[in-house]
Regions:
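S-adenosyl-L-methionine
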Residues: 42
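The AdoMet/dcAdoMet-binding core of the Class I SAM-like
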Residues: 22, 57-179
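SAM/dcSAM-binding transferase cores
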Residues: 2-39, 47-54, 220-273
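A short, structural micro-pattern
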Residues: 34, 61, 215-218
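C-terminal substrate-binding/active-site "lid" region of AdoMet-derived donor-dependent transferases
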Residues: 167-231
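A generic structural signal for alpha->beta connector loops
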Residues: 100-102, 126-128, 180, 206-208, ...
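Short glycine-/acidic-enriched loop or helix-start segments at secondary-structure transitions
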Residues: 92, 161, 194-195, 233-234
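A short, flexible beta-alpha/helix-coil linker loop
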Residues: 45-49, 155-158
Length: 273
């Protein structure tokens, strides 16, 4: 049950109108606290992000824990790009776990940025943690940099905007990846178009795609690989997970095993080619 609701309403000025809209509109960001958990809601009761107040870097929601699996696939990463801020849960995780990485987040909603900065313990004074107010579609299309990871988590009031699920967007994201870069996207599990979106990603990334549905929220996390992993062996990746689990406070192996179960390939390799 939502308690202690705090509401921040941001009227976007003409200067900051998101390029995908073209007129004035209100973007409402609600914040709730229940026991030791603070959550963000954008335009509806749906939880966009949650933070454990006593442990701000803990990944409270299971779908964000699934996202953390990207760490075992990354090869000497330097630059990570996130489209969609929310409460910055996964950004903060990678900021701490990958202590030499630069974290850049693109967020279109100024109210979401304001709430995240005030209430979700973002490392504001770090040179490695940057938030840019912009349209994620345009930013990725026009960016010159290459990224080791691009995570697309751009939900609006009623779900995932269609423009973030179209082939041109997936093509632009792949173009912005390093040679062994990873594209990750959070999809809405109840959306009947989700399977079509995954098929589009498979088309663009030549079937080098993994996905898993979270048990509590129904979110589907998709991992797409720009090229074949240098370390593609399941047994080696499991050893990486065991090492990682000794340093974090949640289990990863359970998610990895579920991903393997979804794979048609039953060999010791994630991908055969």
């Amino acid at each position: 049950m939502i308690s202690k609701i705090k509401k921040i309403i941001g009227l976007v000025s003409e200067k900051n109108i998101p390029k995908r809209e073209g007129e004035f509109f209100e973007m409402t960001v609600d914040m709730s606290e229940t026991n030791d958990v603070r959550s963000m809601h954008i335009g509806s009761p749906t939880i966009q992000s949650s933070m454990r107040i006593s442990d701000p870097y803990h990944l409270e929601l299971d779908y964000t824990q699934i996202m953390a699996l990207a760490a075992i696939f990354l090869e000497k990463p330097k630059d990570l790009l996130f489209v969609g801020l929310g409460g910055a849960a996964i950004q903060k995780f990678f900021y701490r776990w990958l202590s030499k990485c630069n974290i850049v987040t693109i967020e279109i909603n100024p109210s979401a940025i304001s709430v995240a900065k005030q209430f979700f313990k973002i490392p504001l004074n770090s040179k490695r943690f940057k938030i840019i107010q912009d349209d994620g579609i345009d930013y990725i299309k026009n960016a010159k940099e290459k990224y080791d990871l691009i995570l697309s988590d751009a939900f609006e009031e009623y779900g995932l905007p269609e423009v973030f699920c179209e082939i041109p967007y997936f093509e632009d994201c792949r173009e912005r990846l390093t040679e062994h870069g990873i594209f990750m996207i959070n999809l809405w599990g109840s959306d009947p178009r989700t399977s079509a979106y995954i098929d589009r990603i498979k088309l663009i990334f030549e079937d080098r795609v993994l996905h898993l549905k979270s048990t509590s929220s129904g979110n589907i996390i998709v991992f797409a690989f720009n090229s074949l992993l240098n370390e593609n062996r399941v047994d080696v990746l499991k050893r990486k997970i065991l090492t990682m689990e000794k340093q974090i406070d949640f289990e990863l192996m359970v998610y990895f095993n579920k991903i393997l179960k979804n794979q048609k390939n039953k060999t010791n390799y994630l991908f055969l080619s």
